[in-house]
Every structure is written in structure tokens, then in C-alpha cells.
Amino acid sequence: WDELDARIRECAACDLCKRRKRAVPGVGDRQADWLFVGEGPGAEEDERGEPFVGQAGRLLDAMLTTIDLRRGDDVFIGNAVKCRPPNNRTPETAEHAACFPYLQRQIELLQPRLIVALGRPAAQALLNQEIKIAAARGKLFAYNGIPVIVTYHPAYLLRNQPDKAKAWEDLCFARATMRRLKHGA
């Protein structure tokens, strides 16, 4: 893990490294059953080197609490792209391609039981297909045999309050899926 984190922090595989303050490898329990994957770091994450620390991070923490989870306790949080895109734009295909081996290795090391993709860019990076969140909700996908559930990114939910109820449904689906995985049902 430490070697991977160091490689991420030193990465120069795409142009995002030129503007970043800090690469953001991920944070949490390195033996977690739950992996939450976002799109990429924002301004506060770039400053602090930790994912989901701004307003969207506070919402994510609240979302975790609703299903009896806590950051760092059986939960690992990462991003599809490890450096902040300029002006918080959506990461480009080449940027995803440059970062994806890092996410792949994190998943290999972590071996989570369940992955929750937060937002369309994260879902598309993990599933390698075009995704529309509204159509993907409530369905079980897979990444290398690991179940993947798709939901809205917390930053989107901050701008689109009515969809919080849908995200709650997705989290309940994720919790029920994890219970089935743990109890073999």
C-alpha cells in the first residue's frame, strides 16, 4: 500500500500533475469490505491530499452514517482520478486511462466485497461502458467479479436536493447487498 501511495503521489502520467498541489491516493481501512469511488479530487482535496473533505465529503460522511458506516471503519474511499482536474471539470478519457492502473491496484490490494460508484465518471471508469445514473440505479454491476452499485455523486446531490431520496434508496440497496454477501444469501 505505501509503495502504491508513493507512486500515485509522484505520478506524472498525464497533464493533471502539472497543476496539482497534492495527488489524492485514497483514505480509509485498507482491509475494508466497502469501497466508495468518486470522480476526482476537488479544490479542498487537492489542498489536503485526502478525498471527500469538502462539502461533498461532509455529505458523503452523513450518507455513510445513514447505513451505519463510518469513514475509515470497514470503508475505503478513493477516486477514479487521483489529481484535481482544472476548474473541477470532468476528467478526460486520457486522464482516466492514466489513473486507472492505480485504481485497479487499490482494488486488488483491498479486495472489497462491494464497490459503490459515486457518479457517472466513476461508474464509467469502473465498468468501462457508457452509464446513465438514472438507468443504472438499482442494478448490480460487476468489476472483476466484485459487485458494483451506482449512485449519485455527493456534489451532484448538493445541487439537486430532490435526488437525495434516490441516493438513500441506492444506499439501502447497497446495505442489503452487503448483508447478502456477508451471509451468503
Where are these regions (language model features)?
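A polyanion-binding, active-site-adjacent surface
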Residues: 1-185
